[in-house]
Regions:
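ATP-hydrolysis module of ASCE/P-loop NTPase motor domains
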Residues: 26, 49-173, 182, 186, ...
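ATPase/helicase motor core of nucleic-acid motors
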Residues: 36-37, 313-315, 345-485, 498-501
Length: 780
C-alpha cells in the first residue's frame, strides 16, 4: 500500500531492483512513473463506465530499416526518404521516415506535421518535423502548467526558425480537435494527466485510490509540473501520508512545465509539513562539490543550503582551452586512454562526454566511429538524425554529384545546392526532361552540366548558360582537389549556398561546421560520403558497438541527470550555448532572462556534479573575445576558485578561419563609438553613422580582430567643422549630391558622406560647406 512515483521508467525499475536486493523479505511497493500511474487511473475509470474510452497515442515506432533501404548507389540511399512499403504494412504516403524509424501516423509529432502544413505554417515539408517538435514542446508545457484556453489565446509563440515566430493557438486548437474527433477519441501523454485529474475530482474515485495507496512517495519532485502536483495533492490524505524528495538546484525541465516552486512551498501547501535539508554530497570529490556549490549559490530562486563532500579525496577540475577543430582529436585521445585501461585488465573507469545540444556530439561520434572506439549513448539516435536533415542531405547529394557528374539522379538530388547561384532558379523538372530528350535516358554523352549549358544557349538563355558554365568550372576544381572539406566550403562560398535561408539558423550553422571538421579527417570525397552513409544506418551502428562493453558514454546534459561517472568531460561550454543568445526571444516558460540564466546554470551544475573524481570543461578562446567565447559559468567558477588550472592546447586556427570564411557570417569590428569591439550583428555593433575607417565588416573573426588591433597612423577625427578635402573627393561628393541636397541632408545621405570621406561630419558642418563645395567645382 505504498505508492512510489518517479520521473522516468528506468529510475522506477532501478529503485524496485535496489529495494528487492536490500529488503528481500519485504513485499515490494508499487514503483512507477506518474504517467503510468495515471494510465491505471484512467483505465479503472473506463472499466467502471465513468469516462469514455480513450486511445493513447505515442511517438516513434521501433521498426527497423528494411534491407531494401540499402540502395545500390550512395545517391539513392541519400535521397530515398522512405521505401514503397514499410514493415507495418503502411505505404510511404501514410508514413514519414525519421532516420531509420517510421513515424506512427497517429503520433503527436506526425499529427502536428500535418496540421502545420495544412495551416501553411511551413512552406517546405522538410521544415515540418522541426516545427512540429517545437509545437509539441509548447503544447505539452502549457498543458502541464494548467493554462486555460483564454490564456493560450494570448500570443504564445512557436519559434519557427530565423526571425519567424507564430501564435500557438491555431495549432493547439486544430490538434485537440483532431484528437477529440478520432474514433475512438485519442489522448497524448499530457492529456492522460488531465483526464486522470478529472477522474480524481470524483470523490468516490479519489477515496478508492487513497485507500489503495495510503502512503505516497514522490521522487525527483523538482521535475514535477503544476498539473502533476495537483494529482499528488488529490492522492494525499490528511496526516503524514506524503513524502517528497527533490533538489530544486536540479530543476532543468521548465520546457516540460516543471515548477520547483511547488516543492519550495511544500511546508505552506500541506498542514503540519516538515522540510529536511540534506547538505552532503556522497558522489563527488571535494573540489567538484566546492566549485559546484559556489556556482549554484549565485541563483536567487532556490532554497538556502550549502553542499559539502562526504569524500575526503580532493578530486580534480581542469579547464581545457582548445579550438573546435582540435576538440574531436582530444576526445578521441581521452576515450582511447580509458579503453586501453579496460583492455589491460585494469578495473574499468567510466568516462562521460556531456553536451548541451545534440549537434555538439556529432564530431566526437564521427571520430569514435572512424577509429573503432566503442561507446554507448543516451539518445544517440537523435544525433544520427542530424544526418537526415535537409542541410546534410543537400551536402551529401552535392558530393555525390561531384563523384557522378553524368548521373541524372545525382543532378536532380544536388539541384537545390546551386539553384540560388546568381539567381539561377532553373526549373529542375523541365531542365532534366529536356536534357533526357537531347541526350537519351542513359546519358552516354558525358557530364550533364556542359550539356545543360549548351541547351540553355540554344534556348537563348545566355546568362543562365554562363552561370552553369561557372558552376561546372567550380565542380571540376573540386574534383581535382578531391578533398571533402574543401568541397563543402567551396559549395558554401563559391556556389553561394551560405546565402540559403536555412543557413541563418544557429543549429544549421553548427551542423555544417561540424560536417566540415569531420570531412577534414578523410582523404577523399568518396571515403567521406561512404563513412557518413555508414554512420546513418542503425544496423551498422549496432555492429560497431556489439559485445565491446564500452566504458565511454555520450549524453546530453539533460539525459545525464541521475547518472554518475568516474570522469566527466563537458564540451562546447561556450556562451552561445550556455546560457545562449540574449538577443533571441525567450520561450514563454521563462518570465525573464534571469529565469532563463538560472535554469541554464542549474543545468551546468547538474552536468558538473555527475563526476566522481575528475571534471574537465572544454572551452574555445578562454582569454579572448572570440566568436566562441566561454560560458559565463566558467568565469564564475574561476572567480570562486582561481586555482582551477587552465590547459591551453594547440589550436588549428587555419581550418577554423577557412570554415568561418566559407560560412559567410559577418563580423563587425568597431574601433570607436558606443560599442567598440567585435560584433556578430550590425545593430549590436552600433555603427550607424560611423565612417568606414572606424568599423569594418569582416568575413572571419580573426580578420576582425586584426583590424581592431591594427595601429591607426592617421586616426579619423570626429569633427563639427568640414575640413578642406582634396578636390577629387569634393567632386565625388557632388556627383552623388546636389548643393541643395547637401544643405538639406537626411540620415542616409549623411551616412554616405561619412563613409565616403572618412570623417564624422555633423549636418550643420556639411550644410555650411555646401556653398564652398559648389564654388570649388562650379560645373557641378
Amino acid at each position: 500500500n505504498i505508492l512510489i512515483m518517479t520521473f522516468g521508467k528506468k529510475a522506477a525499475e532501478h529503485m524496485a531492483d535496489v529495494f528487492r536486493e536490500r529488503f528481500p523479505s519485504f513485499s515490494v511497493p508499487f514503483f512507477c512513473t506518474i504517467h503510468s500511474f495515471c494510465y491505471r487511473i484512467i483505465r479503472q475509470a473506463e472499466a467502471e463506465g465513468l469516462i469514455k474510452k480513450y486511445s493513447l497515442i505515442v511517438d516513434e515506432e521501433d521498426d527497423p530499416v528494411p534491407e531494401a533501404m540499402d540502395g545500390e548507389t550512395a545517391n539513392a540511399w541519400i535521397v530515398d526518404e522512405s521505401p514503397d512499403e514499410v514493415p507495418s504494412g503502411r505505404t510511404k504516403r501514410e508514413d514519414k521516415k525519421k532516420g531509420n524509424r517510421y513515424a506512427n501516423p497517429r503520433s503527436p509529432i506526425y499529427l502536428l506535421e500535418k496540421i502545420l502544413t495544412k495551416l501553411e505554417y511551413c512552406k517546405k515539408q522538410s521544415e515540418a518535423r522541426t516545427f512540429a517538435e517545437q509545437a509539441a514542446t509548447v503544447i505539452g508545457c502549457l498543458k502541464n502548467r494548467m493554462m486555460t484556453d483564454e490564456e493560450i489565446l494570448r500570443p504564445l509563440p512557436i519559434n519557427m526558425g530565423a526571425d519567424k515566430r507564430v501564435s500557438i493557438w491555431p495549432v493547439y486548437e486544430a490538434y485537440q480537435k483532431e484528437l477529440a474527433e478520432h474514433q475512438p477519441p485519442e489522448m497524448d501523454f499530457d492529456d492522460m494527466l488531465i483526464h486522470a485529474l478529472e477522474v480524481l475530482d470524483n470523490p468516490n474515485m479519489q477515496a478508492f485510490w487513497q485507500r489503495k495507496y495510503p502512503y505516497v512517495c514522490v521522487d525527483e519532485a523538482q521535475d514535477t509540473s503544476l498539473l502533476q502536483h495537483a494529482i499528488v495533492q488529490k492522492l494525499h490524505r490528511t496526516g503524514d501520508s506524503l513524502f517528497m524528495v527533490g533538489d530544486d538546484d536540479q530543476s532543468i525541465y521548465a520546457f516540460r512545465g516543471a515548477m520547483p516552486e511547488a516543492m519550495l512551498t511544500f511546508d505552506r501547501r500541506y498542514e503540519d509539513a516538515a522540510v529536511h535539508r540534506m547538505g552532503v554530497n556522497f558522489r563527488s570529490d571535494q573540489q567538484i562539490v566546492l566549485s559546484g556549490d559556489g556556482l549554484i549559490q549565485r541563483n536567487k530562486a532556490r532554497a538556502k543550503k550549502t553542499m559539502e563532500a562526504f569524500s575526503k579525496q580532493p578530486g580534480e577540475i581542469r579547464i581545457i582551452d582548445i579550438s573546435a577543430a582540435r576538440q574531436g582529436q582530444f576526445l578521441l585521445d581521452q576515450a582511447r586512454r580509458f579503453c586501453k585501461k579496460q583492455e589491460g585488465g585494469e578495473n574499468p573507469e567510466s568516462l562521460a562526454i556531456l553536451y548541451r545540444n545534440n549537434v555538439s556530439a556529432l564530431l566526437p561520434l564521427a571520430y569514435f566511429f572512424k577509429n573503432d572506439v566503442p561507446f554507448v549513448g543516451n539518445k544517440v539516435f537523435d544525433i544520427l538524425t542530424l544526418l537526415y536533415s535537409r542541410t546534410a542531405i543537400n551536402i551529401l547529394a552535392f558530393l555525390c554529384f561531384v563523384l557522378e557528374p553524368d548521373s541524372f539522379q545525382a543532378y536532380s538530388s544536388a539541384y537545390p545546392v546551386w539553384n540560388h547561384y546568381h539567381g539561377l532558379f532553373l526549373n529542375r523538372e523541365t531542365a532534366v526532361e529536356n536534357l533526357r530528350k537531347q541526350m537519351g535516358e542513359e546519358n552516354s554523352g558525358g557530364p550533364i552540366l556542359p550539356k545543360l549549358q549548351a541547351l540553355l544557349r540554344s534556348l537563348g538563355e545566355m546568362d543562365k548558360a554562363r552561370h552553369i558554365g561557372e558552376i561546372w568550372t567550380i565542380l571540376q576544381r573540386i574534383q581535382a582537389e578531391d578533398k571533402p572539406d574543401f568541397a563543402i566550403m567551396a559549395m558554401l562560398k563559391e556556389l553561394e549556398y551560405n546565402k540559403n535561408g536555412s543557413m541563418k539558423q544557429k543549429n544549421v550553422q553548427l551542423l555544417v561546421m561540424a560536417l566540415i571538421r569531420i570531412a577534414s579527417l578523410y582523404d577523399s570525397i568518396l571515403s567521406f560520403v561512404e563513412a557518413m552513409l555508414a554512420l546513418r544506418t542503425k544496423r551498422k551502428w549496432d555492429e560497431h558497438n556489439a559485445d565491446k562493453h564500452p566504458v565511454v558514454t555520450l549524453s546530453t546534459m539533460h539525459s545525464a541527470k541521475g547518472q554518475e561517472y568516474d570522469h566527466v568531460i563537458i564540451i562546447d561550454a561556450v556562451e552561445d550555448l550556455m546560457p545562449g543568445d540574449r538577443s533571441k526571444p525567450l520561450p514563454f516558460w521563462h518570465a525573464s532572462w534571469q529565469d532563463h540564466v538560472e535554469e541554464e546554470r542549474r543545468l551546468f551544475y547538474v552536468a558538473a556534479t555527475r563526476a566522481r573524481h575528475d571534471l574537465r570543461i572544454v572551452v574555445n578562446g578562454l582569454n579572448s573575445s572570440s566568436p566562441k567565447a566561454p560560458s559565463p559559468f566558467i568565469h564564475e567558477m574561476l572567480r570562486d576558485n582561481p586555482n582551477i588550472p587552465v590547459e591551453k592546447l594547440a589550436a588549428d586556427d587555419a581550418l577554423e578561419e577557412q570554415i568561418e570564411e566559407a560560412m559567410g557570417i559577418p563580423y563587425f569590428a568597431v574601433r570607436r563609438g558606443k560599442t567598440p569591439g567585435i560584433h556578430r550583428e550590425y545593430e549590436k555593433a552600433g555603427v550607424e553613422g560611423y565612417s568606414c575607417p572606424v568599423y569594418r565588416r569582416c568575413t572571419t573573426w580573426r580578420k576582425a580582430n586584426r583590424f581592431l588591433n591594427k595601429a591607426v597612423s592617421c586616426p579619423v577625427p570626429e569633427t563639427e567643422t568640414a575640413p578642406d578635402l582634396p578636390l577629387p573627393v569634393e567632386k565625388a561628393l557632388l556627383r552623388l549630391f546636389s548643393v541643395q541636397q547637401l544643405k538639406e541632408l537626411d540620415a542616409n545621405r549623411l551616412k554616405k558622406i561619412r563613409q565616403k570621406t572618412g570623417y564624422l561630419f555633423s549636418k550643420e558642418a556639411i550644410a555650411a560647406k555646401a556653398v564652398d563645395y559648389a564654388a570649388c567645382a562650379p560645373e557641378y
